[in-house]
Amino acid sequence: MSAQPVDIQIFGRSLRVNCPPEQQEALNQAAEDLNQRLQDLKVRTRVTNTEQLVFIAALNVCHELAQERGKTRDYASNMEQRIRMLQQTIEQALLEQGKITDRQGTQFE
């Protein structure tokens, strides 16, 4: 489906954005999250300039995203290492099983 205009409120300002209908709930949730972040920043920093608050919130979100990307990379690397170790263990077990089978086969002849 094509994107349709959706009105959202960000920090007391109306904003119309195009959004696919199936993503409208996620957009509304993101707007709520941003509003909460801006409100929290306003209280915590005592900055009253909306533009400054928006930039600070954007920087915070970018920082959080970078941290999560790093965690994802670390997790993926860890999983790749574990998979390699598991593959080696399985291959070693199969080789040993093959050796045992070969030995057992020769004993029965």
Curated annotation (Swiss-Prot):
Signal peptide bounds: none
Residue ranges of coiled coil: 21-99
Keywords annotated in UniProt: Cell cycle, Cell division, Coiled coil, Cytoplasm, Septation
Location in the cell: Cytoplasm
Any one annotated GO CC term: cell septum
Gene3D superfamilies: 1.20.5.50, Cell division protein ZapA protomer, N-terminal domain
GO biological process: division septum assembly; FtsZ-dependent cytokinesis; septin ring assembly
Family: Belongs to the ZapA family. Type 1 subfamily.
Function: Activator of cell division through the inhibition of FtsZ GTPase activity, therefore promoting FtsZ assembly into bundles of protofilaments necessary for the formation of the division Z ring. It is recruited early at mid-cell but it is not essential for cell division.
Quaternary structure (record): Homodimer. Interacts with FtsZ.
Listed name of the protein: Cell division protein ZapA
Originating species: Pectobacterium atrosepticum (strain SCRI 1043 / ATCC BAA-672)
